[in-house]
């Protein structure tokens, strides 16, 4: 399709990672190594420059290629990016992300883990230290080798919540109210992202069935920023994001 000049918005993981060795480490040999570098990451709120370049190529009669960000990377990156890009996060310390997703995030194939009698009334971590979305989040946020990511499966049909713990940079001492203002300024031009008031946290029920995302942020007394992001993994983070 690309060779024929067709612009492609890909919802799989084939074009999310730009570095072939990293792709092969976490997945397998890339299906199209030569296309990885030119693919724009499909997360409009955070990768506008890449998407604008793809749009320019398309306007010039060339094919554009977009690799839509995955579900966990979407919620996690939306939650963490404003603080990181503002320089408030220690650039040498690990960042911890714990995320919870509903069972439809695993796809429609029947498995023991997603079978009703196994998933109902059950919460469990999986892919600990090995989940393939780890390098994608690191790439978007510039956290190479510093992300501790642990996904969890919850008995929800739809909805994903990511909690990101970010160590404050030396000398940084924002208040929660200042962070809320920072986040709202950051997403002022992003109508699908809402930032909650100080003391209020995102809820999966508020975004399920939509392409919207909610973010929350607070300062922890231990010198941390705790940022949370909620989305519907079938909307923002999948098909809906492709449309966006």
For each of these PLM feature ranges, what is it?
Residues 2-4, 82, 182-186, 243-244:
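Short, solvent-exposed amphipathic alpha-helical segments in soluble enzyme
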Residues 221-224, 228-244:
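An anion-binding loop in the catalytic cleft
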Residues 1-119, 126, 218-221:
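N-terminal Rossmann-like NAD(P) cofactor-binding subdomain of oxidoreductases
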Residues 73-77, 173, 236-237:
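Loop/helix-junction capping segments adjacent to catalytic residues or to phosphate/diphosphate-binding pockets
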Residues 21, 78, 178, 240-241:
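Generic recognition of short, well-ordered alpha-helical segments
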């Amino acid at each position: 399709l690309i060779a024929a000049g067709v612009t492609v918005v890909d919802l799989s993981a084939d074009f999310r990672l730009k570095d072939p060795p990293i792709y092969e480490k976490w997945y397998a040999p890339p299906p199209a190594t030569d296309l990885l570098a030119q693919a724009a990451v499909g997360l409009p709120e955070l990768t506008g420059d890449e998407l604008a370049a793809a749009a320019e190529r398309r306007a010039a009669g060339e094919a554009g290629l977009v690799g839509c960000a995955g579900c966990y990377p979407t919620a996690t990156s939306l939650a963490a990016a404003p603080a990181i890009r503002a320089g408030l996060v220690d650039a040498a310390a690990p960042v911890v992300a714990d995320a919870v997703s509903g069972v439809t995030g695993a796809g429609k194939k029947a498995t023991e883990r997603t079978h009703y009698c196994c998933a109902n009334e059950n919460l469990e971590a999986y892919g600990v230290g090995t989940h393939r979305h780890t390098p994608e989040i690191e790439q978007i946020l510039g956290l190479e080798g510093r992300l501790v990511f642990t996904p969890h499966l919850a008995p929800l049909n739809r909805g994903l919540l990511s909690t990101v713990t970010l160590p404050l940079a030396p000398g940084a001492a924002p208040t929660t109210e200042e962070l809320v203002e920072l986040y709202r300024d950051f997403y002022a031009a992003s109508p699908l992202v809402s930032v909650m008031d100080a003391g209020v946290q995102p809820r999966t029920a508020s975004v399920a069935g939509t392409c919207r995302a909610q973010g929350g942020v607070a300062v922890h007394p231990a010198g941390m920023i705790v940022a949370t992001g909620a989305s519907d993994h079938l909307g923002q983070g999948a098909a809906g994001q492709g449309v966006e």
